[in-house]
């Protein structure tokens, strides 16, 4: 028989439930069961002697009511091994001062063994303290059912609040992850855009350099053409001046004899 994980909550001896059992009473001892050795979840009291005196009707009814309340607060643990169903009910034995001291020692020891963090969010620490609180509720419920039920409401409220905070935390983490992915995607897009703009800039610079080279070639060609034209025009002017001087000399030579 392999018991479930050890817990700080005090349980009775695990019992083997018959395979043909369809309905279980509030306490597993009322079934056709075979008691086994206790687990290491904590000190387990010795079972009451079979030949002992029976409880008065009022006490028996009160004990049954306490058992039902305990089962509603802390449901029995069930597991299957080799096709057999095992059930372990939470203990209804009142706690002594030694049990409380032992609970504290067990809590400290398991916190150290499982290396629970002392601060911050720690699932291990939360689990162990939840088990400790459940054991305290069990102890209080046996002494006063009303006080135990009130503590149950406190426990459920705390769990609901923690669950709400956990949901909020998970949604915040998911939101942060989405934003991080969006930022990463935006970063990739911006890097690609920067690369494209860099290539476009280099292409434009190449075109500018080509146009500058063309402009310089055109300016050089036009300067050379202008020099050729200026030289040609200067030669034409000199030719026209010489021609004009020759014509003037000829004209003067023609006019001078006529005056005589």
Swiss-Prot record:
Among Pfam families, the record links this protein to:
Ax_dynein_light
In this UniProt entry, which cysteines form S-S bonds?
Answer: none
- Region of interest: Disordered: 1-66
The record's account of how the chain is modified after translation: May undergo some post-translational modifications that shift its mobility on SDS gels.
A Gene Ontology cellular-component term: ciliary base
Q: Does the keyword Coiled coil apply?
A: yes
Q: Name one GO molecular function term.
A: dynein heavy chain binding
The record's keywords, sorted A to Z, are: Coiled coil, Dynein, Motor protein
Ranges in coiled-coil conformation: 177-260
Do the record's keywords include Membrane? no
Q: Its function?
A: May play a dynamic role in flagellar motility.
Under PANTHER family, the record lists:
AXONEMAL DYNEIN LIGHT INTERMEDIATE POLYPEPTIDE 1 (PTHR13183:SF0), AXONEMAL INNER ARM DYNEIN LIGHT CHAIN 28 (PTHR13183)
Family assignment?
Answer: Belongs to the inner dynein arm light chain family.
For this entry, the protein name equals 33 kDa inner dynein arm light chain, axonemal
Organism this protein belongs to: Strongylocentrotus purpuratus (Purple sea urchin)
Taxonomy of origin reads: Eukaryota, Metazoa, Echinodermata, Eleutherozoa, Echinozoa
């Amino acid at each position: 028989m392999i018991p479930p994980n050890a817990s700080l909550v005090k349980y009775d001896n695990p019992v083997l439930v018959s395979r043909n059992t369809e309905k279980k009473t509030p306490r597993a001892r009322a079934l056709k069961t075979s008691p086994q050795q206790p687990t290491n979840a904590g000190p387990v009291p010795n079972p009451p002697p079979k030949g002992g005196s029976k409880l008065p009707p009022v006490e028996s009814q009160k004990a049954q009511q306490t058992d039902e309340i305990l089962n509603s607060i802390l449901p029995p643990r069930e597991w299957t091994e080799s096709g057999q169903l095992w059930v372990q009910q939470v203990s209804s034995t009142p706690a002594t001062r030694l049990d409380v001291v032992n609970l504290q020692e067990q809590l400290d020891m398991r916190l150290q063994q499982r290396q629970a963090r002392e601060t911050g969010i720690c699932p291990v620490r939360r689990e162990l303290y939840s088990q400790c609180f459940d054991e305290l509720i069990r102890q209080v419920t046996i002494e006063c059912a009303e006080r135990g039920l009130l503590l149950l409401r406190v426990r459920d409220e705390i769990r609901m609040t923690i669950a709400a905070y956990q949901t909020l935390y998970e949604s915040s983490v998911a939101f942060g992850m989405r934003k991080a992915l969006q930022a990463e995607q935006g970063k990739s897009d911006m890097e690609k855009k920067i690369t494209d703009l860099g290539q476009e800039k280099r292409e434009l610079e190449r075109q500018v350099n080509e146009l500058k080279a063309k402009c310089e070639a055109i300016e050089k060609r036009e300067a050379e053409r202008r020099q050729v034209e200026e030289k040609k025009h200067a030669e034409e002017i000199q030719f026209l001046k010489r021609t004009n001087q020759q014509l003037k000399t000829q004209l003067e030579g023609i006019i001078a004899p006529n005056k005589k």
